[in-house]
C-alpha cells in the first residue's frame, strides 16, 4: 500500500490510501501467504525442492493473471554451487529499452528444514512470504495504470545463502545496460510496526534520493 502511494507521488497519480486498500483483496493476501508458508513447501529451500514448488505456484499465479515475463520466460536462471537456481522476473506493461526502470522485489526462498521433530520446518510466513505477496499484489495494482518508467518485479532465490539471486539479477541488468532509477525490496513486513499502522521503515536511506522524491 505504501509503495503504491510512493510511486504515485513520483508520477502525479492521485490515489489515496483508502482507494488503494479497496483494490487489495485481503482474502487473496491470506491465501497466498498460507500456500507459500505451508508445510508442503518444506521451508522453500532449493535443496529439498521446496523452493521450486513455491516458484511453480508463483508462475502459475502470474500466468493466470495475464502477466508477462521480462525475459523469454519467468525464470531468470543462474547457478549456485553448481546447482541450477532461478529468480522469477516479470514486468508491468511494455518494457522499453533505455527508459528509466524501477525494480520491486522480495526474496522467495527460506531456510528449509532443520533437525528432526514435530515442528522442524521453517515455514517463513513473515520471512518472507509477506514480502512476496506484497510484490505480487502491488504488481497487479500497478498494471491497471500507465507509467512513464519501466516497472520490473522480481522474487529472488537464495537470499538466505548470501543474496545470491538478487546479485545475479543485478549483474545481468547491469550487463544489459538497464537504467535502474530505484530498487525497492520488501522484507518481513507481516507484522505491524510499533510506530503504527501503515508505517514503514526504510533502510538504505543514504544510498539514494528516494525519500526526498516521496516527500
Per-region residue spans from a language model:
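Sec-exported extracytoplasmic/periplasmic mature domains
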Residues: 34-42, 59-68, 91, 137-147, ...
Amino acid at each position: 500500500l505504501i509503495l503504491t502511494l510512493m510511486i504515485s507521488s513520483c508520477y502525479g497519480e492521485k490515489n489515496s490510501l483508502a482507494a488503494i486498500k479497496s483494490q487489495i483483496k485481503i482474502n487473496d493476501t491470506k491465501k497466498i501467504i498460507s500456500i507459500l508458508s505451508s508445510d508442503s513447501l518444506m521451508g522453500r529451500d532449493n535443496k529439498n525442492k521446496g523452493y521450486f514448488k513455491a516458484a511453480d505456484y508463483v508462475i502459475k499465479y502470474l500466468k493466470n493473471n495475464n502477466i508477462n515475463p521480462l525475459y523469454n520466460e519467468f525464470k531468470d536462471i543462474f547457478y549456485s554451487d553448481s546447482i541450477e537456481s532461478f529468480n522469477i522476473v516479470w514486468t508491468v506493461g511494455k518494457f522499453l529499452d533505455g527508459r528509466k526502470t524501477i525494480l520491486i522485489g522480495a526474496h522467495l526462498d527460506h531456510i528449509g528444514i532443520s533437525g528432526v521433530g514435530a515442528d522442524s520446518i521453517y515455514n517463513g510466513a513473515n520471512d518472507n512470504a509477506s514480502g512476496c505477496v506484497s510484490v505480487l499484489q502491488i504488481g497487479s495494482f500497478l498494471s491497471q495504470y500507465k507509467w512513464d518508467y519501466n516497472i520490473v518485479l522480481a522474487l529472488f532465490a537464495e537470499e538466505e545463502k548470501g543474496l545470491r539471486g538478487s546479485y545475479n539479477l543485478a549483474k545481468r541488468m547491469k550487463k544489459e545496460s538497464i537504467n535502474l532509477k530505484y530498487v525497492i525490496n520488501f522484507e518481513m513486513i507481516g507484522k505491524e510496526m510499533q510506530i503504527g499502522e501503515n508505517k514503514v521503515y526504510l533502510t538504505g536511506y543514504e544510498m539514494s534520493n528516494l525519500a526526498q522524491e516521496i516527500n
